[in-house]
Amino acid sequence: MSLKNSYVTSDYMEWDSMLSLVRKLYRDKEYRLSLLIGCGSFFGLRISDILSLTWSMLLDDEKFVIIEKKTGKRREIKVNTNFQKHIADCYTALGVVDKNERCFISRKKTVYSTQRINMLFKAIKSKYNLKIEHFSTHSMRKTFGRKVVEAAGENSEFALIKLSELFNHADVMTTRRYLGLRTEELLETYDMLSF
């Protein structure tokens, strides 16, 4: 919980750190958490939409469609072919019987709450000694965005336009701020000065 009048935001993870965490969680038999962090980072969805995913959505086709809870807009997601194997491995390891079952349910068979996931993330951060200051459910979406921008290289402006549309942001500047790029750009101004 944040202090009143304080500004706390989630941070993104470096892509390789995220992949390493997903693998470690899987190795430690934390299949649902491994899949949750993978889905969040590969799909760029809000946690409310991730929690609505079913196994059939992830396994039956290379694409699936959701109606975003926050915006009510239709969004088509393509499942990365490299990530599909991890999804299938988690499905098998969990021994899921019903493909229509939600992917992210607790041992009590109830869908996790965002608050519960954030508590689990806090424990994960500590247990796996993650080098991320503010690790929350939003970190996955930011990890996705950062990776897309970094992978675009010289075409990063075009990537920001695409992300702005994917994230349903009003404009590219909102996406820049959201990913923390604007703050970095402003801080670089101080490095332009010489002494």
PLM region descriptions:
Residues S52-F83:
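Conserved tyrosine-mediated DNA breakage-rejoining catalytic core shared by Y-recombinases
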Residues S2, M13-F43, E154-N155:
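Basic, Lys/Arg- and aromatic-enriched nucleic-acid-binding interface segment
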Residues L36, G44, S48-L53, L163:
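Alpha-helix N-cap/helix-start motif at helix boundaries, enriched for small hydrophobics
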Residues M18-L19, N82-I132:
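Active-site/catalytic core of tyrosine-dependent DNA strand-transfer enzymes
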Residues M1-L19, G72-T81, N100:
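DNA breakage-rejoining catalytic core of tyrosine-based enzymes
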Residues E68-T71, F167-M192:
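Catalytic-site neighborhood detector that most strongly recognizes the C-terminal catalytic loop/helix
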Residues I132-A151:
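Short basic/aromatic active-site micro-motif
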Residues D49-I50, G145, G153-N168:
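Active-site-proximal segment of tyrosine recombinases
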